[in-house]
Structures are given as structure tokens and as C-alpha cells.
């Protein structure tokens, strides 16, 4: 007797995804609902989903940022491939967009109780972008960055709600991730930059989460928010795509009374196997002349990246690596102060201002990698593992013709391990639950060796140094987190979360810390308007003191006496807000926030002994900081014109401080209710983007013209010129660092940027980018590093 077994053969579903103007949408997600099957579109808008079980009914959906999700019903039949094409209508209703910044796991934006800003690949693709901080400045309410002071410089201090990823601000940190891996930050005395090793052309999207209410699951050093950068994967189509960019840069250098010239070249190649694997590789090289008198060396940078993405059964494996090299000479950043020396009679100015520039320079190498593995048990249950490393090696060599050499080398390493699982379940016709739980661990170390020697060598050993100094420090953070979202009829979302963590910094155990979180969002409709009301409360992780703050150190000009009794910074806060959607083409976001910071850490030079050559200082805890404000954002489309704007009001003041508020020495600086220095009272941005259509069959892509106007409001600060008058002009009495006579208000200013990009053919485009048209120079924070003047960049983009 023969037994016949029939096994149905799977089928293939393919098609294209375009917008309502007929243009392909690159990176759109197409998926079969209720399954783990899906794919992303390539540069032609094409997708393919293979090995789909036959003889079944499915709902297939296409989703793309800035467009309305579309779903279709299909039936598969053995031996018959299916073609399903989608045309997505542009829409500002983004409630179904998936974000991961708040909870690590994927969750729709409608369930988020805190505001999340998403910057899509489309935003980055249609206009020339130099660095990521420029994008964030215009797109994120309450966010801004200081203007760069050197060519090619990416700001390491992008500010959110008055807190910053930079140093010197007692308002916590912004934690930055790339593909799930935490970057080195100021907790390790490293300057992370926002994109000093990532080419903006390699970015797929950026998610920004503001404040402690949404960042509690991320633990320490994330008090002010999260910036999560996702880089591109390859295309699973069998096409190989090559991109080239050539750019020329001209930067005004007022100090030199000349222009600084630069050039940039970018190459990338992506492709893969349509069924299971893809790759993406590329590099970016830039050379810029200095804008200040230097020792003849340019600023050189090289960035290289690579990624491989593979699908094996129900698991997706994504491996990425990046490498960055850079070098530059020494500049005289005191050069323009010589003008003040003459004009303001600074006859007591330090003699070293007139010293000739030293030979040598600085160089760095920054490698990193990430491994992301996602495995689906069912369509509603998956696990994820992230393993990665961010490193940096820095070398400083400085020597004069008739004296010895100064030498400094620093090595940083940070390893990240994050494992979680995500589970969803429908428990009744009205209720759904969404649970994420996991563990995260980071291990960081920093080794610093400095000294001087008499002779110049290519390789140095410990015994070569005359006055060697070695610092070896390590940090560890271990956290366990969980978050539950209860959904009632897809309208009411209740979020409950908690992180429990331990921190050990430079050998000191800061114990166990708990970070709870509560959130609520409610969706309603009035006529044609959708309203999302939201409220959130959270207590962020601690910010332990940095080694440079707690431990003593000494430089050529100053002495830090150290303060081992520093307490970690803490933060909590709440926010209330609403998102209003008027049809597909108008959106308004309003948020009020109230955040309390405790034990902020800041530099205190008031202990300086004026009779000694070197300046003495230490770091202290500064009591309470109360940070309140409003954030407003709006977007609309009027024909081919896209308009977006945001405006933030920031009221950052000192609260209770028993240490300083009873001391008349600090009057005007730390009084209860007094505004903090260097925090603008308001920020804003207006962006107008006109989409230019293609004018011939050879140029269907068209292009864009954008005008960006950024506004920084009035801010309180020190009159640095008056302070130096007191130090260097013998006819002016010296001022203490905290003299209230130094206080002033810096006027508001605007920064204007014009960008243009047009595809002459479907394979070639030209672009022009003019930054800082108003030629504003901001000296409110440091008169030795004024902002750059007008910067012009022009070039050519090719796709092959």
C-alpha cells in the first residue's frame, strides 16, 4: 500500500510602493499582518516577500514615515506568485509610526505618553546635510546647538530643554545611541560628538526623546533625553547601487581676513540577495583649511562604514562596523585676543599669548561595531540581543624647536550588552497588553598617559618621560527594566515602567537606584480632528560624578583639588501635552514640562588663591534647579510647500541651595528663583521647503529649496571682556568670578540657512548649502572660540 503526502509550496509576493505623485518610496515597510513576514523597499520602491504559505488569506500593509498606512486583502494560491502594488498618500498623521527610543522595543507612536521626534530618511535624503546636529537643531522642539567654531566640526553639545550632552552644564546628559549601542560620553571625559564618525548619508532615521519622563528605562546619564540614530541596511534586491558625492566648501575666516577652503568626497555601495541577505559599505573623506592661524596642517577626516544584514528563518541578524580617523595641527585660538590686548590696554596679559605656535598636532582613531539579533517566536512575541562597542584613541604631540615635547595619549572603550523580549496579547475584545522586559549592561574604561621628554621619537616608552602621569579609570552600569502598556480599545494607553540599576564609577559603588515611570495617552476625534492627549511622570537615572570632578588633577595653568564627597545628580519631572491632527496636512504639538534637578555638579573657581600662579578650583553640588517650559511644534503642507516650525519657552531657575544662597559672594548667580546663566529664555525654528518638480522624462525626481531660520532668545551670562579687563588692564579693578557686576544679558539672534538640491537627471543631482547667512558670531560662552562666519558648500551627487 502506498501513502501519498502532499505539501503545499510557498509563494512569493512582490510589488512596488510609490507616493501619490508616482515617485518610489525608498525604505517603506511592507508586511503581512499577524505574521513575522515582511520586507523593505529598495531604491526603486520594489519589495519582495518570499516563502509565504499558500492557500491562505492575509492582510498586507505598507507603511512609510509621513504617509498614510494602506492595507489590502489577498489570498495565496499554490504555484501562483502575487503582485501587490501600493500608492501611499502623504499624511502628517503619524500615530501608527513605530518608535523604539523610549522602550527599546517596537511600539506605535500612539501609545507613547512622551513626545517623540522622528527624522526620516526622506528628510535627510532630499536636502544636503552636513552633520546630524544641524538636522536636530531645526526639527526638535527645545533643542539647539552652538554654532561650530572650526570647519568640519560637529557639535558635541546638542541641548535639550536646557540639559546637554556637553560638559559644564549641571543639567544631566543626553544619551546617544547608534543602532542600539551607547556611545562614549562625558561620563568618561570623552567628547562624543553627534556625528564625528557617522556620515549623514548613512543615516536611515533618528528618534529623539526629550526629558526624564520618557528616558527612565535607559538609566544613568540619560536625564535630559535620548538620541537614537539608526544607520542604513543594504537592499535585498539583486541590484547594486553606487552613490558618489563631491563637494567644495568655502568658509569665511574673519580672523584671517580670508576664506578657508575645504573639500569632501563620499562613496557608498549597497545591494544583496533578494531572499535573505544585504550589504552596505562606504566612506567619507574631508579636508578643511583652518580658520585661525595655525602651524600649517589642515583638518583631515576619514570615515568608513560597513554592514551585513541577513534573515535566517524567523531571525534577523544585523552586523555593522564603523571606523573614523582624523588629524589636525595646532591653532592660535588666542590670536584675535591680541586685538583686544591693544584696544583695551591689556598690558598684564599672559606672556604665552605671544608665543610662537608649536609643531605637532593631534590625531584620533575611532572604531566601533554593533551586532543586533532579533528572533521571533510568534507574530506577537520576539526577543532581541544587542552587543556593541564604541572606542576612541587620541594622541597629542606638541613640541618647540628649543625645548622638550609634550605628549598625551588617551584610550576609551565602552561595551554595551542589551537583551530584552517583547510580548503582546489580546486579553479581551477591549483590552490588549504590551510588555517589554530586559537587562542592559555597559562597561567603560579610560586610560590617560601624559608627560614630557627631551627628544623626539616615533615610539615612546614609560621610562622616556620626565614627569609621567597615568590615570586608569573604569565605570560599570547594570540595569534591569520592564514596561507594561495596557491598551483599551486602541484609544486609551496606560504605561507603567521601572528600571533598577547599580553604578560603579572609578571604584566607588553608588548603590542601587530605582527609576519609575508612568504615562497615559488618550485618543479622541472631534469632527475631522484627531486629538492625542498625553501625560507622563518619571524619575530619571542618576548621573554619578565624573573622575575629573571627584579626583584631583593639575595642568600647566590650573589645579583641580578634587572633591570625593560629590553626590550624583538626580532628576524627576512631569509633562502634559496634546497632539492635534487636522486632516492629513496640518499637525500641532503642545507640551508643558516641569523638571526638578537635584545636586547638579559644576565647576567652582571661587576658591582660587590670587597669589598663586595657577588657578585653583573644584567641583561642588549646587542644590536644586527647576526647569519649566512650553514646547510648540507645527507642520503643514500647502501644495508643493512644506512648512514646519517650533518654538520653545524655557524657564530654568535655581531652587533651594543652602550652600550658596546665604553667602553674599554669590549674589545674583544662585539666588532662589534666579535664572541660570547661558540658558536661552526661548528657541525657535522656521523651515520652508519648496518641492521643485522634474521638468523632463530624464529628471522625474525634481528637487527641493529650503530656507531655515533658527532663533536663540535672550540669555543671561558673564561679560567676559569686562572680566578680562579686570585681570589684564592695570587701570581696572579685578572682578571675582562671581561678581554680580559681570552679569549681562546677551541679545537674541537669528541664524539663516539656505539649501538647494535638484536632480538634473534621475542619476545626478547638484546641491548648494549656505549656512549662517547672517554671519552671527556668538561669544557668550567663550570669547576665544567665536563661531564661524558664512559657510558655503556646493557639489554633485551621483547614483549608479
Residue ranges and their predicted role:
Residues 254-270, 349-372, 406-493, 524, ...:
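Outer-membrane beta-barrel transmembrane domain signature of Gram-negative proteins
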Residues 276, 288-297, 301-375, 382-383, ...:
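Flexible loop and strand-edge segments within Gram-negative outer membrane beta-barrel domains
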Residues 134-181, 205, 215-232:
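Extracytoplasmic beta-strand/coil segments of soluble accessory domains associated
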Residues 266, 414-418, 473, 563, ...:
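Outer membrane beta-barrel strand-and-loop segments of large Gram-negative receptors
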Residues 268-270, 284, 309, 530-531, ...:
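Conserved C-terminal beta-signal and adjacent last beta-strands/turns
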Residues 596, 618-716:
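Gram-negative outer-membrane beta-barrel transporters
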Residues 47-50, 181-210:
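Short acidic/polar hinge/loop motifs at secondary-structure boundaries
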Residues 18-23, 28-33, 61-68, 77-125, ...:
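Short, acidic, small-residue-rich periplasmic hinge/interaction motif at the N-terminus
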Amino acid at each position: 500500500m502506498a501513502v501519498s503526502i502532499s505539501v503545499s509550496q510557498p509563494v512569493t509576493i512582490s510589488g512596488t510602493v510609490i507616493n501619490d505623485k508616482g515617485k518610489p518610496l525608498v525604505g517603506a515597510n511592507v508586511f503581512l499582518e499577524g505574521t513575522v513576514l515582511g520586507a523593505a523597499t529598495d531604491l526603486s520602491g520594489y519589495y519582495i516577500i518570499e516563502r509565504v504559505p499558500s492557500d491562505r488569506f492575509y492582510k498586507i500593509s505598507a507603511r512609510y514615515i509621513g504617509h498614510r498606512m494602506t492595507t489590502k486583502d489577498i489570498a495565496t494560491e499554490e504555484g501562483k506568485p502575487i503582485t501587490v502594488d501600493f500608492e501611499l498618500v502623504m499624511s502628517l498623521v503619524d500615530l501608527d509610526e513605530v518608535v523604539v527610543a523610549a522602550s527599546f522595543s517596537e511600539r506605535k507612536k500612539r501609545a507613547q505618553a512622551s513626545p517623540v521626534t522622528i527624522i526620516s530618511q526622506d528628510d535627510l535624503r532630499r536636502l544636503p546635510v552636513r552633520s546630524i546636529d544641524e538636522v536636530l537643531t531645526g526639527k526638535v522642539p527645545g533643542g539647539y546647538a552652538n554654532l561650530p567654531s572650526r570647519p568640519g566640526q560637529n557639535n558635541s553639545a546638542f541641548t535639550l530643554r536646557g540639559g546637554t550632552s556637553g560638559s559644564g552644564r549641571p543639567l544631566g546628559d543626553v544619551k546617544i545611541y547608534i543602532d542600539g549601542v551607547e556611545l562614549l560620553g562625558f561620563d568618561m571625559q570623552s567628547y562624543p560628538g553627534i556625528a564625528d564618525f557617522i556620515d549623514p548619508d548613512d543615516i536611515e532615521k533618528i528618534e529623539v526623546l526629550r526629558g526624564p519622563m520618557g528616558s527612565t528605562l535607559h538609566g544613568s546619564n540619560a536625564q535630559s533625553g535620548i538620541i537614537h540614530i539608526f544607520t542604513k541596511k543594504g537592499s535585498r534586491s539583486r541590484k547594486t547601487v553606487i552613490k558618489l558625492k563631491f563637494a567644495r566648501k568655502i568658509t569665511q575666516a574673519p580672523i584671517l581676513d580670508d576664506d578657508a577652503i575645504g573639500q569632501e568626497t563620499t562613496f557608498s555601495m549597497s545591494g544583496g540577495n533578494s531572499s535573505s541577505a544585504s550589504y552596505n559599505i562606504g566612506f567619507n573623506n574631508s579636508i578643511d583649511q583652518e580658520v585661525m592661524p595655525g602651524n600649517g596642517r589642515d583638518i583631515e577626516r576619514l570615515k568608513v562604514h560597513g554592514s551585513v544584514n541577513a534573515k535566517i528563518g524567523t531571525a534577523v541578524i544585523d552586523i555593522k562596523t564603523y571606523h573614523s580617523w582624523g588629524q589636525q595641527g595646532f591653532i592660535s585660538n588666542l590670536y584675535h585676543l591680541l586685538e583686544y590686548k591693544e584696544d583695551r590696554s591689556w598690558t598684564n596679559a599672559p606672556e604665552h599669548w605671544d608665543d610662537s605656535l608649536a609643531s605637532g598636532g593631534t590625531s584620533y582613531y575611532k572604531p566601533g561595531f554593533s551586532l543586533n539579533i532579533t528572533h521571533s517566536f510568534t507574530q506577537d512575541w520576539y526577543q532581541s540581543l544587542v552587543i556593541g562597542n564604541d572606542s576612541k584613541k587620541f594622541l597629542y604631540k606638541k613640541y618647540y624647536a628649543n625645548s622638550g615635547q609634550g605628549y598625551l595619549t588617551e584610550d576609551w572603550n565602552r561595551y554595551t550588552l542589551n537583551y530584552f523580549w517583547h510580548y503582546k496579547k489580546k486579553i479581551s475584545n477591549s483590552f490588549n497588553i504590551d510588555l517589554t522586559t530586559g537587562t542592559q549592561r555597559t562597561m567603560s574604561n579610560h586610560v590617560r598617559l601624559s608627560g614630557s621628554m627631551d627628544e623626539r621619537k616615533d615610539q615612546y616608552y614609560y621610562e622616556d618621560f620626565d614627569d609621567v602621569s597615568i590615570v586608569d579609570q573604569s565605570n560599570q552600569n547594570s540595569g534591569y527594566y520592564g514596561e507594561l502598556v495596557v491598551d483599551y480599545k486602541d484609544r486609551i494607553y496606560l504605561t507603567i515602567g521601572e528600571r533598577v540599576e547599580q553604578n560603579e564609577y572609578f571604584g566607588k559603588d553608588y548603590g542601587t537606584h530605582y527609576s519609575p515611570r508612568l504615562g497615559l495617552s488618550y485618543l479622541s476625534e472631534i469632527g475631522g480632528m484627531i486629538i492625542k492627549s498625553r501625560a507622563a511622570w518619571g524619575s530619571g537615572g542618576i548621573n554619578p560624578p565624573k573622575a575629573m570632578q571627584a579626583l584631583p588633577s593639575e595642568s600647566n595653568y590650573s589645579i583641580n583639588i578634587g572633591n570625593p564627597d560629590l553626590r550624583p545628580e538626580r532628576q524627576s519631572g512631569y509633562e502634559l501635552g496634546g497632539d492635534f491632527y487636522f486632516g492629513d496636512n496640518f499637525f500641532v504639538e503642545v507640551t508643558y514640562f516641569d523638571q526638578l534637578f537635584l545636586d547638579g555638579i559644576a565647576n567652582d573657581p571661587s576658591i582660587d588663591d590670587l597669589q598663586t600662579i595657577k588657578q585653583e578650583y573644584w567641583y561642588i553640588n549646587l542644590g536644586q534647579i527647576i526647569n519649566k517650559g512650553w514646547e510648540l511644534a507645527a507642520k503643514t503642507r500647502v501644495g508643493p510647500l512644506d512648512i514646519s516650525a517650533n518654538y520653545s519657552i524655557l524657564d530654568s531657575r535655581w531652587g533651594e541651595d543652602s550652600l550658596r544662597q546665604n553667602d553674599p559672594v554669590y549674589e545674583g548667580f544662585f539666588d532662589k528663583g534666579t535664572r541660570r546663566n547661558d540658558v536661552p529664555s526661548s528657541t525657535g525654528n522656521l523651515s520652508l521647503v519648496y518641492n521643485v518638480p522634474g521638468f523632463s522624462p530624464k529628471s522625474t525626481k525634481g528637487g527641493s529649496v529650503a530656507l531655515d531660520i533658527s532663533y536663540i532668545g535672550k540669555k543671561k551670562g558673564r561679560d567676559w571682556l569686562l572680566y578680562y579687563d579686570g585681570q589684564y588692564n592695570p587701570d581696572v579693578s579685578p572682578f571675582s568670578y562671581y561678581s554680580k557686576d559681570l552679569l549681562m544679558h546677551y541679545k537674541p539672534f537669528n541664524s539663516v540657512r539656505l539649501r538647494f538640491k535638484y536632480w538634473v537627471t534621475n542619476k545626478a543631482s547638484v546641491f548648494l548649502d549656505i549656512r549662517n547667512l547672517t554671519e552671527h558670531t556668538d561669544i557668550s560662552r567663550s570669547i576665544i572660540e567665536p563661531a564661524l562666519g558664512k559657510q558655503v558648500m556646493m557639489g554633485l551627487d551621483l547614483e549608479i
